[in-house]
Amino acid sequence: MSRLLFIALPLLVLASIPLYLLVLKSPPPMPKLDLEEWWGPPELKQKQDTSIKPFEITFSETMVKELKERIKKRRPFAPPLEGVGFKYGFNSKQLDSWLKYWAEEYPFAERQKFLNQYPHFKTNIQGLNIHFMRITPKVPKDVEIVPLLLLHGWPGSVREFYEAIPHLTAVSRDRNFALEIIAPSLPGYGFSDAAVRPGLAAAEVAVIFKNLMARLGYKQYYVQGGDWGALIGSAMATSFPKEIIGFHSYMALTLSPAATFLEFVGALFPSLIVEPELANRLYPLSEKYSTLLEELGYMHIQATKPDTVGIGLTDSPAGLLAYILEKFSTWTNPDLRSKEDGGLSYRWTKDQLIDNLMLYWSTKSIVTSMRLYAESFSSRHFDLKLDEIQVQVPTWVLQAKHELAYQPPCILKLKYTKLVNASVIEDGGHFLAFELPEIFAKDVLKAIGEFRKLKNVKTEL
């Protein structure tokens, strides 16, 4: 009897798959997003300025002086437990040296100049002044310039792309196109305004960026994103398939019921779902879910009470540094948690990481950046069911070894029906554009080259 059950159970599971997927094949209706929803102060609605203005990043003397004073007047930190590295979070033994560098050695004027090396702009979209960089390469007459909307996530910023931009915009004899980069700060992040009322979630940010690209004159363009950029980019590809002609992501995921079902089927029969050499990226599920549970505590806080924790992070440079840089340690490679210094020098210099901190500190935007979690994990946003609506846009994924979550192509195709390729690399983590800028850029360029072959259309200006 037990032998018969052993044979029958797998057959029953396999037989149920087509039926289950058939039931889920009928997608929910496309939600109607308000393309003109106003997120700024109501009294300014009749006075909107739609011009595009140059912008320059400035670290004022007053702000820098106050920052240094706050660092100097910090309270002593509780000593860490012995031998824990970064397993309990940022190791307080490492904090003093980081804060000393920030206050005494970080070259504020030099880094301000560095951050302004690319052209920055602001324009008002739906009541919010949206900051963005726009980098247009100089090209020969026979090379077409095509636009790429480049989207960051949390706790990153446009700073993640600085090292990749020269590779992305490079002109090559092997390509008949070159990329123009449009890299905005998400609403509530850095130099972009935050909403004044609740409701600005990933789907609504997608509308803002659609309108931004329209303001810049583009009818069609490519989108690339990781972290929140992946979710927003996916929402754009889902909602606006006429405008988005290709989507590249290094964190493309689908959280639909069908995807979850297939993941559990794969737990019983991994070879049905994932290539053997990649099985350890997804299975065993108990291990993967345990890791996610350990790492997603911040998400629960930010999805429920972002303003509370944000008060401390806005007030304390030590708190902000520890909170953000702990993510740059753990999410780059989980093995770095065992290192006493968190392995933060593994990929970056202190200046690179503090540049990113400065975009949060100087703008007091840590609270408003975290509110995106509360809005996007709300029941209202889940009720849009965007994740259950298939993307009809050509999609390309880049899958780093240490990304927080992995899904094989057979699962991704439930959402991204025109999945062109899944590039798998045995290196890199969550901040891939910042970690491995050249590898990242090469993959993006390869993807866009393939997208152009598939559709054989010119981007419309």
Curated annotation (Swiss-Prot):
Record GO terms (molecular function): cis-stilbene-oxide hydrolase activity
Cellular component per GO, a single term: endoplasmic reticulum membrane
Keyword ATP-binding: no
Record keywords, A-Z: Aromatic hydrocarbons catabolism, Endoplasmic reticulum, Hydrolase, Membrane, Microsome, Transmembrane, Transmembrane helix
UniProt xrefs under Gene3D superfamilies: alpha/beta hydrolase
Catalytic activity: cis-stilbene oxide + H2O = (1R,2R)-hydrobenzoin; 1-(4-methoxyphenyl)-N-methyl-N-[(3-methyloxetan-3-yl)methyl]methanamine + H2O = 2-{[(4-methoxybenzyl)(methyl)amino]methyl}-2-methylpropane-1,3-diol
Enzyme class of the recorded protein, top EC level: hydrolase
Entry's pH dependence statement: Optimum pH is 7.5-8.0. Activity decreases rapidly below pH 7.0 and above pH 9.0.
Assembly: Homodimer.
UniProt name for this protein: Juvenile hormone epoxide hydrolase
Organism: Bombyx mori
Gene designation: JHEH
